[in-house]
Amino acid sequence: MREYTMRGTMAPTEVTRPLVVDDGRFTHGFIIEEMRIWSAGAALPTGFSSNACLSLYDTPPATMNAEESGTIAWSSWIENTTNGIDQFFIIDPEHVINQDLFLHNMGGTAMNYLIRMVPITMTPEQGVLQLVKAVNNNS
């Protein structure tokens, strides 16, 4: 199966970046397989820490809380002289993305990102269900 990647660098002042995946056909979507972030600059004397999340909405969530139902993936990168590098990413596997996606820089630091995804074709009913699920999840 073919894979797609989105990658780039976000400045410390860039809070939200739109990632266009919507091609206008709601029966075409993507499943996020991996989301990685890492430092985009030299580590600070005390280390580097960054948090990011992928969301279906252009407004960043207040926290990295799993109750933010429009958020579908979380990632963190911590680099310091004591513990080396610690990284994690968590992805909600039930989401099929068939609309635009937004990457939120929750750490206020310069970061690189790489998002790996695979395409999926759905029936019209499945596509509508994903759109309805996205709207209902934000309540």
Where are the model-predicted features located?
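Beta-strand-centric surfaces of beta-sandwich/beta-rich domains
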Residues: 1-139
